[in-house]
């Protein structure tokens, strides 16, 4: 199968077949699989970016590594912009945000607690940051 030897070639061929409405020649099984994986990829990207942002918010608010604050602030702002863009491009991810927000916080918290550099800090079990998308992406949540 072309998809196994030349992915871009397979994509181009599939696009051509669809545009020509030559549906009986389309590799439907692989096309469906690829479309499903796109959705999973978008969800994974949201989880990863949100977890990174929450981890850096925790570092900024609950540690005293002042020399790292600026870098963490930059990472938070970049994560906010990237999450805004992702949600603007895929608004149907907004309900997913609510489903994974606390899990992302738990992942960020575990990551820090497992790191010896942060074990001496009192990190909160409950998320101190707003879960509402418009609040956490539009303001300096570390204040």
Go through each PLM region and give its residues.
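Surface/interface-facing alpha-helical segments and adjacent flexible terminal/loop regions used
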Residues: 1-51, 58-143
């Amino acid at each position: 199968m072309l998809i196994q030897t030349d992915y871009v070639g397979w994509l181009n061929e599939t696009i051509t077949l669809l545009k020509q409405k030559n549906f009986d020649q389309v590799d439907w099984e692989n096309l469906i699989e690829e479309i499903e994986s796109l959705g999973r990829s978008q969800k994974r990207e949201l989880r990863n970016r949100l977890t990174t942002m929450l981890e850096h918010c925790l570092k900024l608010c609950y540690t005293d590594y002042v020399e790292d604050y600026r870098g963490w602030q930059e990472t938070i702002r970049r994560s906010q912009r990237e999450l805004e863009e992702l949600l603007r491009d895929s608004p149907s991810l907004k309900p997913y945000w609510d489903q994974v927000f606390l899990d992302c916080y738990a992942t960020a918290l575990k990551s820090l607690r497992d790191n010896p550099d942060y074990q001496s800090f009192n990190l909160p079990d409950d998320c101190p940051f707003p879960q509402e998308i418009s609040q956490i992406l539009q303001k300096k949540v570390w204040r």
